[in-house]
UniProtKB/Swiss-Prot annotation:
Residues 16-45 form a propeptide. Expressed by the venom duct. Disulfide bonds join 46-60, 47-58, 52-61. This is Conotoxin reg3.7. It is found in: Secreted. The modification Cysteine amide is found at residue 61. It comes from Conus regius. Residues 17-37 are annotated as: Disordered. The cysteine framework is III (CC-C-C-CC). Pfam families: Conotoxin (PF02950). One of its GO terms (cellular component) is extracellular region. Residues 1-15 form the signal peptide.
Length: 62
């Protein structure tokens, strides 16, 4: 028991990453941006119609 107590004091359980702290659980910013889509039109500031269905952040789709 003493060894377990010492180990927990040196390495608390709160130091371990929890499920919500994993990078895979957090959405990637580059995947959400329409500007990073290769079909993005910088003049119109949107994507052509067929590809805007998959990209929720296109301004002129809809």
């Amino acid at each position: 028991r003493v060894l377990l107590t010492i180990c927990l004091l040196l390495f608390p359980l709160s130091a371990l990453p929890l499920d919500g702290d994993q990078p895979a659980d957090q959405p990637a910013r580059h995947m959400q941006s329409a500007e990073r889509n290769p079909r993005f039109d910088p003049v119109k500031r949107c994507c052509p119609y067929p590809s805007c269905i998959d990209i929720p952040f296109c301004d002129c789709c809809g």
